């Protein structure tokens, strides 16, 4: 499966298919050269010279980058020149080894092309200078995305961690106690499988409304949970609150839950609307998906938080679709109910005999897909 369990459009991290393709390309090229009957010494010389030229071109490029970094040596590297050199040139041992090996083969093997070393170096420098000036070797969007994902440079990564540490990690541990207090005050309004969880809505288009009833009139605000306060970043008694909503179906209440949007999606939407952020709608969609995936990974490593919340990820509907947000939420609630019933099938089925009618009623747990009725006269 190449996507997250939250939603089919959320991708998993990239794998190693590029290396697999490179290995296949290596085998194909070696087979082609072997079939052409290329002499091994001639093949080795050209291969070494080509590898050396690639590394030399890369070295020229990084030296040009070093010229820029030296202008920022104090604010970026605290005046440490060796850090600046390592940041631009990478490992000097690797370059030294490649250059020494290349010089050895250049001297020891016959020079069939009859070109002096100085001429070759000058042409390499010329070609790399043109590449830099014309921008011919810029990274593709896929390469940039891969680097950002691997090194956690994405906007989504910071937003997900900020959302978890600054909000979810604070409210989720005490959520059940607050729901219990709420039920005591409101005649057990929150009941059922989803009564002890926070349901977080993730519209992938980042369309977050301040009023859920405006998104769907079948979602009706009921009450606020008891508030939670904490001293946070110099703010004494900072208040955190959550809202209880009632879900309607055909005009009748069919469920209640603690519900809200993921607020960082508002930040992504605002960035895409502000030209100063340089954030396109495509960037917004990509970062929204990565935000969901990153938060899913964070919660997977925090079981106490994970069991107290559920993420509801969905695509905003088109004009032709009959999408209903309330039905999407109800689908998740009912799915959890079915999962609870399925988990209960591991229990033992107890069938009361004729002599047990005077005893206290016992819970009947079915081994079927649907729960059995509690009446026994129909068996």
From Swiss-Prot:
2',3'-cUAMP binds at residues 167, 238, 263. Phosphorylation by TBK1 leads to activation and production of IFN-beta. Following cyclic nucleotide (c-di-GMP or cGAMP)-binding, activation and translocation from the endoplasmic reticulum, STING1 is phosphorylated by TBK1 at Ser-366 in the pLxIS motif. The phosphorylated pLxIS motif constitutes an IRF3-binding motif, leading to recruitment of the transcription factor IRF3 to induce type-I interferons and other cytokines. In contrast, lacks phosphorylation site at position 358, leading to reduced production of type-I interferons and other cytokines. GO terms for cellular component: autophagosome membrane; cytoplasmic vesicle; endoplasmic reticulum membrane; endoplasmic reticulum-Golgi intermediate compartment membrane; Golgi membrane; mitochondrial outer membrane; perinuclear region of cytoplasm; plasma membrane. The record marks 358 as: Not phosphorylated. A lipid is attached at residues 88, 91 (S-palmitoyl cysteine). GO terms for biological process: autophagosome assembly; cGAS/STING signaling pathway; defense response to virus; innate immune response; positive regulation of macroautophagy; positive regulation of type I interferon production; reticulophagy. It comes from the Eukaryota. Coiled coil: none annotated. One of its GO terms (molecular function) is cyclic-di-GMP binding. A motif (pLxIS motif) lies at residues 363-366. Residues 340-379 are annotated as: C-terminal tail (CTT). InterPro entries: STING, STING_C_chordates, STING_C_sf, STING_LBD, STING_TM. The modification Phosphothreonine is found at residue 356. Keywords: Cell membrane, Cytoplasm, Cytoplasmic vesicle, Endoplasmic reticulum, Golgi apparatus, Immunity, Innate immunity, Ion channel, Ion transport, Lipoprotein, Membrane, Mitochondrion, Mitochondrion outer membrane, Nucleotide-binding, Palmitate, Phosphoprotein, Transmembrane, Transmembrane helix, Transport. The modification Phosphoserine is found at residues 355, 366. Gene3D superfamilies: 1.20.5.5200, Stimulator of interferon genes protein. Changing residue 358 to S: Restores STING1 ability to induce a strong inflammatory response, resulting in type-I interferon activation and virus inhibition. 2',3'-cGAMP binds at residues 162, 167, 238, 263. It is a multi-pass membrane protein. Homodimer; forms a homodimer in absence of cyclic nucleotide (c-di-GMP or cGAMP). Homotetramer; in presence of cyclic nucleotide (c-di-GMP or cGAMP), forms tetramers and higher-order oligomers through side-by-side packing. Interacts (when phosphorylated) with IRF3; following activation and phosphorylation on the pLxIS motif by TBK1, recruits IRF3. Interacts with TBK1; when homodimer, leading to subsequent production of IFN-beta. Interacts (via transmembrane domain) with TMEM203. In absence of cGAMP, the transmembrane and cytoplasmic regions interact to form an integrated, domain-swapped dimeric assembly. In absence of cyclic nucleotide (c-di-GMP or cGAMP), the protein is autoinhibited by an intramolecular interaction between the cyclic dinucleotide-binding domain (CBD) and the C-terminal tail (CTT). Following cGAMP-binding, the cyclic dinucleotide-binding domain (CBD) is closed, leading to a 180 degrees rotation of the CBD domain relative to the transmembrane domain. The pLxIS motif constitutes an IRF3-binding motif: following phosphorylation by TBK1, the phosphorylated pLxIS motif of STING1 recruits IRF3. IRF3 is then phosphorylated and activated by TBK1 to induce type-I interferons and other cytokines. Facilitator of innate immune signaling that acts as a sensor of cytosolic DNA from bacteria and viruses and promotes low production of type I interferon (IFN-alpha and IFN-beta). Compared to other mammals, STING1-dependent type I interferon induction is strongly reduced in bats, suggesting that the cGAS-STING pathway promotes a limited inflammatory response. Innate immune response is triggered in response to non-CpG double-stranded DNA from viruses and bacteria delivered to the cytoplasm. This is Stimulator of interferon genes protein. It comes from Eidolon helvum (Straw-colored fruit bat). The lineage of its organism: Eukaryota, Metazoa, Chordata, Craniata, Vertebrata.
